């Protein structure tokens, strides 16, 4: 396979994901802007609530849905179409069930935060935000499996279009709820949930009326929802752990900020910096998603060399981006914070930490791409082990020791993250170097076979016409659904 062709295939999948992710992450920036104009306490409380919502809700749902990636990607490559629909159905049900205890946790955050030593004023604002943010769980439970279901078929533009419409409405919703209706922090939370719901509506409309994809409800039967869970759960659980371990690190950083000399300024600055890392993360995330899809297709189609080529090219792209991101944030360290606040103390903390954040991206970008390879090869347990070691055995002790032991303060937390990212990168590269790609092809066959529900008396056969098997996109994929009886 030509290197140029594979790079074009990766960028065709990744570019719409970059645009979509920027749009989705920009909603947090818009929300932070409205919070900053409500006051310093509101900004700090809102940032704390967003972080808590991400690590206890969004990260869990997103992590579980990552378990779909290897099954759907490899099933698509192996042309086992029914497996895609059944996997979506099971994942949606799983996320709905998991959302219940998450919602209960959100509704009881005040005693949790106070026992952890957080400022009472900040905690009160965070409690209010989380109360009105609960509908986001239902919206996320639909969004994550549906976007994965579409992406593994090479369909990324529907999400981009839905995100564009949704983000255009987001400032309007914030203005109506926060300014006109004077709901304050409540309005910011409601507007955020509305944003995700709007994306869901767009994707569902596309799914219902488009003839260019496998339908997620194909083969839906009550008994199919009670069978064949193990392949999905065995991937979803470690995937969730891997994602959550990384997400939780940022929440720990927020909590540690609350123990510094000026908790309000430190928490607010950390919230803005975490949003900044979110913006920078969209390109590595897109590369990772593209790698996972292409590697899954290659392994499902019995092409180990193509999977290895995809891995190498993806890592090269990720390294180049990491270097560019480091230069970008370092150059803008004196002006970046002014986009969010005019508080001198907060601006000083942001400016001091941005160069360290830039160094973190040099490690974060390629290690995120490497995570995509592990996802595409159905090895989430390896990713979980790496994140546990890098972030909690190495990074957390470095952060605590540097911040409080050596009295470095706010920047010490970011030195901890830097050590974690570099450790993670080294361990990921070591894991990939030892990969036996021929063995991964055999594992892909075993996985898709196990995920197929062979107990049904009926199965659906889907005939796909693809102009170029190595270049699947929403423009060249035509799928007709035919029902055959065994």
Swiss-Prot record:
Family, per entry:
Belongs to the multi antimicrobial extrusion (MATE) (TC 2.A.66.1) family.
Region annotation (Disordered) maps to 448-474
Mention one GO biological process in which this protein takes part, according to its record.
xenobiotic detoxification by transmembrane export across the plasma membrane
Q: Which GO terms describe its molecular function?
A: antiporter activity; xenobiotic transmembrane transporter activity
Entry's InterPro entries? MATE_euk, MATE_fam
The Gene Ontology CC terms held by the record are: membrane
Official protein name in the record = Protein DETOXIFICATION 53
State where it is primarily located.
Answer: membrane
Where does the UniProt annotation locate this protein?
Answer: Membrane
Q: Which organism is it from?
A: Arabidopsis thaliana (Mouse-ear cress)
Q: Which domain of life is it from?
A: Eukaryota
A Pfam family per the record: MatE
Q: List all membrane-crossing ranges.
A: 15-35, 45-65, 94-114, 130-150, 159-179, 187-207, 240-260, 267-287, 312-332, 346-366, 386-406, 413-433
* UniProt keyword terms in alphabetical order: Membrane, Transmembrane, Transmembrane helix, Transport
Q: How does it sit in the membrane?
A: Multi-pass membrane protein
Q: Where is the composition biased (Basic and acidic residues)?
A: 453-466
């Amino acid at each position: 396979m030509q290197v140029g062709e594979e790079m074009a295939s990766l960028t065709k999948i990744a570019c719409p994901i970059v645009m979509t992710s920027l749009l989705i992450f920009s909603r947090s920036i818009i929300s932070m802007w409205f919070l900053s104009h409500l006051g310093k306490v509101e900004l700090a409380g809102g940032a704390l609530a967003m972080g808590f919502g991400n690590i206890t809700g969004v990260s869990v749902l997103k992590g579980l849905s990552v378990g779909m990636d290897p099954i759907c990607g490899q099933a698509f490559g192996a042309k086992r179409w029914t497996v895609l629909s059944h996997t979506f159905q099971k994942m949606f049900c799983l996320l709905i069930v998991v959302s219940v205890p998450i919602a209960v946790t959100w509704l009881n955050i005040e005693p949790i935060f106070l026992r952890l030593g957080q400022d009472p004023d900040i905690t009160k604002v965070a409690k209010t935000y989380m109360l009105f943010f609960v509908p986001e769980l239902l919206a996320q439970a639909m969004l994550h499996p549906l976007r994965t279901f579409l992406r593994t078929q090479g369909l990324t533009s529907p999400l981009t279009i839905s995100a564009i419409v949704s983000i255009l409405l987001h400032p309007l919703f914030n203005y109506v709820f926060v300014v006109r209706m004077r709901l304050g922090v409540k309005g910011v939370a409601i507007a955020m949930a509305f944003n995700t719901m709007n994306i869901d509506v767009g994707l569902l409309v596309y799914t219902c009326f488009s003839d260019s994809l496998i339908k997620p409800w194909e083969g839906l039967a009550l008994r199919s929802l009670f069978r064949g869970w193990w392949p999905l759960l065995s991937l979803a659980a470690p995937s969730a752990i891997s994602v959550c371990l990384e997400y939780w690190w940022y929440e720990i950083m927020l909590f540690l900020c609350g123990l510094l000399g000026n908790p309000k300024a430190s928490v607010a600055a950390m919230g803005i910096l975490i949003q900044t890392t979110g913006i920078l993360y969209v390109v590595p995330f897109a590369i990772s998603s593209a790698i996972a899809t292409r590697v899954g297709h290659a392994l499902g189609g019995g092409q180990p060399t193509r999977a290895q080529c995809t891995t190498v090219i993806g890592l090269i792209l990720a390294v180049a981006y990491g270097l560019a991101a480091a230069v970008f944030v370092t150059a803008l360290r004196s002006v970046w914070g002014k986009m969010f606040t005019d508080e001198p103390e907060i601006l000083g903390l942001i400016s001091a930490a941005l160069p360290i954040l830039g160094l973190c991206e040099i490690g974060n970008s390629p290690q995120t791409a490497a995570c995509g390879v592990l996802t595409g090869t159905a090895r989430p347990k390896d990713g979980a082990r790496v994140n546990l070691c890098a972030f909690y055995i190495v990074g957390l002790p470095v952060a605590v020791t540097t911040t409080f032991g050596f009295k470095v303060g706010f920047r010490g937390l970011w030195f901890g993250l830097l050590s974690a990212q570099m450790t993670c990168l080294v361990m990921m590269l070591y894991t990939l170097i030892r990969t036996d790609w021929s063995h991964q092809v055999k594992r892909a066959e075993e996985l898709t076979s196990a995920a197929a529900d062979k107990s049904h008396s009926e199965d659906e056969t889907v005939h796909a016409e693809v102009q170029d098997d190595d270049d699947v996109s929403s423009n060249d994929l035509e799928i007709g659904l035919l029902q055959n009886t065994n």
